[in-house]
């Protein structure tokens, strides 16, 4: 799967080195555009989430992550938060926008499962620009330099992303640059919501399965570079992107209270980053 609209909306790819690398440039993207979905093109049958390729009224194609799929709103919350954190840390991530789905959208689609999904997803969903012509990253063919690999491992340990493995790398090559996609399996604490403060300090043992861990020799250096970028101000602006519509699933907490939990989770995890850094270093040592 891929994402993105016109090339002009993204940094111009310029890496010609056989090792994949790019500068740790930060991008301020704290306001998401909105558009209305107009045409369902085809389903992208990946796992249980059933995203789709669709067109919006701005004329561009998007990979749509539906709020009615699998884990419902929690998946699009994780996708939005994880993607924008990755962008802040300097990684290439397709532009994310809010996509409004109305009752008439996709009515001609004959698949009953898809019809049920669309009915459950009326309102705001999340779209990623479609990167036409992109290919999946293959660790057996494309080598990653230690700095970039270490920073990606740090990102995924920070946001507790369990889904960047050899089986499913969730990275794309597009114009000789590496792009990160699919962060919907991050923040898995919100699926149980119990003891979230304790989970914020977790070592994240799933990092042992990370596809880039063998290349990540500079995880401490990555921590020193990336941790300061996760400022309180950025985190507050980030969680404020979450629409109320996605925050109605906890009857005990209001949308603002849920936003505060996500913000506090990120702040606590940042302050205790040495815990997950050590876990990643130990896991890598066990691979050698």
Q: Which functions belong to the PLM regions below?
A:
Residues 1, 11, 23-24:
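Short terminal hydrophobic/aromatic SLiMs and anchors at protein ends
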Residues 18-29:
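Short, Lys/Arg-enriched N-terminal segments with co-localized hydrophobic residues
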Residues 7-19:
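Arg/Gly-rich low-complexity intrinsically disordered repeat tracts
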Residues 3-7, 28-29:
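Acidic, Ala/Val/Gly-enriched low-complexity intrinsically disordered segments
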Residues 27-288:
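Phosphate/dinucleotide-binding and metal-coordinating scaffold of catalytic cores
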């Amino acid at each position: 799967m891929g994402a993105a609209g016109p090339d002009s909306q993204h940094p111009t790819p310029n890496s010609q080195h056989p090792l994949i690398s790019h500068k740790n440039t930060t991008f301020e993207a704290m306001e998401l555009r909105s558009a209305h979905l107009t045409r369902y093109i085809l389903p992208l049958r990946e796992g249980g989430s059933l995203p789709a390729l669709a067109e919006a009224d701005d004329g561009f194609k998007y990979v749509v992550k539906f709020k009615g799929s699998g884990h419902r709103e929690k998946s699009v919350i994780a996708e939005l938060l994880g993607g924008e954190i990755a962008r802040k840390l300097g990684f290439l991530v397709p532009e994310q926008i809010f996509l409004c789905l109305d009752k008439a959208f996709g009515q001609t689609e004959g698949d009953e499962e898809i019809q049920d999904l669309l009915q459950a997803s009326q309102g705001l969903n999340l779209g990623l620009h479609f990167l036409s012509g992109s290919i999946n990253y293959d660790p057996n063919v494309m080598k990653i330099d230690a700095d970039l690999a270490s920073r990606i491992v740090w990102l995924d340990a920070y946001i507790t992303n369990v889904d960047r493995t050899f089986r499913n790398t969730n990275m794309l090559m597009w114009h000789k640059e590496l792009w990160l996609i699919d962060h919907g399996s991050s923040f898995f604490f919100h699926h149980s919501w119990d003891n979230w403060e304790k989970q914020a300090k977790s070592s994240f043992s799933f990092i042992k399965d990370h596809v880039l861990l063998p290349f990540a020799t500079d995880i401490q250096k990555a921590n020193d570079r990336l941790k300061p970028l996760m400022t309180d101000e950025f985190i507050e602006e980030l969680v404020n992107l979450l629409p109320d519509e996605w925050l109605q699933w906890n009857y005990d907490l209001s949308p603002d209270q849920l936003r505060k939990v996500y913000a506090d989770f990120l702040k606590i995890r940042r302050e205790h980053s040495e815990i997950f850094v050590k876990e990643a270093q130990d896991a890598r040592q066990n691979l050698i």
